[in-house]
């Protein structure tokens, strides 16, 4: 049963048939796609997804890719898109379609730390996140393993800190540790130090319906220790959409957000006035949609897409007709 039928009066979240897709695409210039769980799972493309995106390009549609994953640079994501068959520009402009949280976090810190002499950030994250920061003039420390120093709390409290750290940035960090958490807290106790999280995704979809813990788990740990909230860059934050809009000159009324998560992709689209499509190849399910439709919570009712598809490969009949 379609979620719209299950949700009573809420007419949103109808299956995107070929006929509906043709009508929708006639009124759309730009399609923004999440990546993990939408285009691919791990290193495997969703069947039919590359063909669908190549067909959209052939129709003259402008594509953008908005990912909360901070473990890759824009250039690395552009290379993965080409490697898995999704097409896209080559050469110096290859990465311009990609808006990842590593890149957008760098833009945010460049704004917030403008005028600061030799800005520096303590990064709980990947070399890619550090590289994007350094590309805009923000030095980074902290990337990589950081074992406990000393025998107990007194030693941990007095472990040396880098001078002039003006922000703690929390991204996806497979080396996250108690020592890093303690250092982050100590930096955040210094006056004026910012706390920035790349995203709040609680888990990441991989192949065969499996998941791993996401960045949101790490951000929450730092927030709890510091007793303050982080500035969040990724979806559903408006900031990441503003990054896209400034570079693309988007008309929201002629733009679609396609994603697999109600609480990030679909909520971002609803907040920014975009049409939304949920694909069922990732995290959220039609059961989740039904729960949101039937909820009395206003914020949950925003997390209901206009349309849904089993996979973005479902767009192919509309594009080939």
From Swiss-Prot:
SUPFAM superfamilies: HAD-like. Keywords: Carbohydrate metabolism, Hydrolase, Magnesium, Metal-binding, Protein phosphatase. The record marks 204 as: Important for substrate specificity. It holds the Pfam family Hydrolase_like. Binds 1 Mg(2+) ion per subunit. Its EC number is 3.1.3.21, 3.1.3.48. GO terms for molecular function: ADP phosphatase activity; glycerol-1-phosphatase activity; glycerol-3-phosphatase activity; magnesium ion binding; phosphoglycolate phosphatase activity; protein tyrosine phosphatase activity. InterPro entries: HAD-like_sf (IPR036412), HAD-SF_hydro_IIA (IPR006357), HAD_sf (IPR023214), PGP_euk (IPR006349). Mg(2+) binds at residues 34, 36, 260. Homodimer. Belongs to the HAD-like hydrolase superfamily. CbbY/CbbZ/Gph/YieH family. NCBIfam families: HAD-SF-IIA, PGP_euk. This is Glycerol-3-phosphate phosphatase. The gene is PGP.
